[in-house]
């Protein structure tokens, strides 16, 4: 007899296979931030035509709002030049408030429905967000509430991806020099000749979280074929 799979296993399998659904860019107009739902600076619930979606920003990473992912917290402490994990969390709360205010009205979502994993039981997908002509990712980095370090995408098109990412790295360098946002109390400095922060290879912490959920589900699975 085949025993019933636990909900955690179903979620884990979905997270692993979710990228198969990713395709062409789609535009969702007249979106709104879902009220009274979990969010942080770069991940939030969005309402569109009566449906609730969770989106995670491409290209950037905001400080965490809790310490549940120690590897990411440690990496953010170094990148933002913060001495304590509590400073990261405090900066994460400010990034959250920035995004909440930025998305107070209607906005546009561009997505390929690429799986962003995470630890929610609801599917989460990567996206680019616009309010008018303003790109949320760019504004977060400009204000020092995010770093130019995140899942890349072929946006705005394959030929211009590098210039877009280079622009984000220049915005981060400006935020460090101006000591704004998470860089207000930073110990990080830049040489006078540095016009952009160094490019870093992306580390997919989202996959690690999804893998942990799947493994937890598999560890609790018992199957009897007799």
Predicted regions and their residues:
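Bacterial N-terminal signal peptides that target proteins for export
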Residues: 1-9
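Bacterial N-terminal signal peptides
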Residues: 8-16
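Small beta-barrel nucleic-acid-binding modules, primarily SNase/OB-fold domains
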Residues: 19-226
């Amino acid at each position: 007899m085949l025993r019933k799979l636990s909900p955690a296993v179903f979620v884990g399998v979905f997270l692993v296979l979710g990228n198969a659904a990713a395709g062409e860019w789609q535009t969702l107009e007249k979106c709104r931030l879902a009220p009274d739902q979990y969010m942080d600076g770069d991940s939030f619930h969005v309402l569109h035509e009566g449906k609730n979606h969770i989106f995670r920003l491409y290209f950037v990473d905001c400080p965490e709002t809790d310490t549940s992912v120690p590897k990411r917290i440690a990496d953010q402490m170094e990148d933002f030049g913060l001495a304590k994990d509590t400073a990261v969390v405090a900066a994460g709360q400010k990034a959250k408030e920035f995004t909440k205010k930025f998305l107070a009205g209607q906005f546009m979502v561009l997505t390929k429905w690429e799986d962003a994993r995470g630890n929610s039981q609801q599917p989460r997908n990567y996206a680019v967000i616009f309010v008018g002509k303003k790109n949320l990712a760019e504004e977060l980095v400009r204000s020092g509430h995010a770093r130019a370090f995140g899942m890349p995408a072929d946006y705005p098109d394959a030929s211009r991806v590098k210039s877009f990412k280079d622009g984000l790295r220049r915005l981060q360098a400006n935020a460090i020099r101006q000591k704004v946002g998470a860089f207000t109390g930073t110990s990080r400095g830049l040489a006078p000749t540095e016009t952009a922060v160094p490019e870093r290879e992306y580390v997919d912490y989202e996959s690690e979280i999804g893998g942990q959920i799947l493994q937890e589900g598999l560890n609790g699975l018992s199957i009897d074929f007799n």
